[in-house]
Amino acid sequence: TDWKCKVLDRTSLIIEIFGARARTKEGVFQVELAALTYQRSRLVRSWTHLERQRGGLGFMGGPGETQIEADRRLINERISKLKKVLKEVRRTRALHRNARQRIPYPIIALVGYTNSGKSTLFNALTGSNVYSQDQLFATLDPTMRGLELPSGQKIILSDTVGFISELPHELIESFQATLEEVTEADILLHVHDISHPNAETQKSDVLLVLNKMGLTDDADVPILEVRNKIDCLDTEEREFQLNQSSRSEKKIILISAKDGEGLKTLLSTLDTELNTRNKVMKIKLPWTDSKTLAWIYKRGQVIKRRDGNESVDLTIKLHPSDVARLENRLNS
């Protein structure tokens, strides 16, 4: 029977969905690079199959040889061009990150399995209108917005691409520029759909990808677990989750991004996490650098101060991200 429909393997299907969701030139280029890289790996197999049909395996220089070389050359040329474009994208992103280092705001990144509700949470916290739908890979391109915590601490919240189990290698390589935004965050909020029947498996899949990126619970960047969609749980399951979160050694925040439940707790937890991670350091600052002195008083806590004739000796407490920003100011 002729069904007249496209047949795709898992990787091709994921790439096709990514292609349908891409909304920026960068996203389109990243998907195209992944598709071509995967297509190139399949060229030899497809042409070998054709040779078998034609009975051409018994001699060199079969009918498919010239065509496969031409196909490979065209694909390689396009891949080379795309890599150059995306290399420039990564360079631009690096410049933007360096610029943000001078802005005294920690970066909080939302990570999680696809369709876990990250964009809905992002919109609920920032009042933005980022595209969010009940579908796979609704977000491909990182989006950032400013947000003020209850203490008055300002942060930058970043919404990122959703993960999936056994994410194809081609996609990880192609989306390197996007994934780098995750590695530069000060805190990761791991959002997962607690109502999903495979919630624990999805959680493990995300942690595995983060681990491959060098981000673990033992790393400098803390990972806070945010269990979303508690509004979809029945009373018994909700009680179970509440008991489990209260007994856990690690901080677990239960929320409903859709209804707003638990968002105040999430924000206050971020406040606490940022404050407890502050580092103490000593610096000598010349009186001529009054702007940096004002910046320190605005961003950190001055524990001890001793004024000299030409400089001031300070013992201060700063968030790790602000320590890096202060070092950039002092070295610029």
Model-found features: residue ranges?
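Flexible beta-alpha connector loops of hexameric P-loop NTPases
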Residues: 21-25, 67, 129-131, 161-171, ...
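Inter-motif core of Ras-like GTPase G domains
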Residues: 171-196, 211-215
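C-terminal-of-GTPase-core extension/linker across diverse P-loop GTPases
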Residues: 41-116, 122, 197, 208-332
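Switch/coupling subdomain of P-loop NTPase systems
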Residues: 1-54, 62-63, 317
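Switch I (effector-binding) loop of TRAFAC-class P-loop GTPase G-domains
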Residues: 93, 100-106, 124-156, 164-177, ...
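Short amphipathic alpha-helical segments with heptad-repeat character
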Residues: 23, 30, 34-37, 41, ...
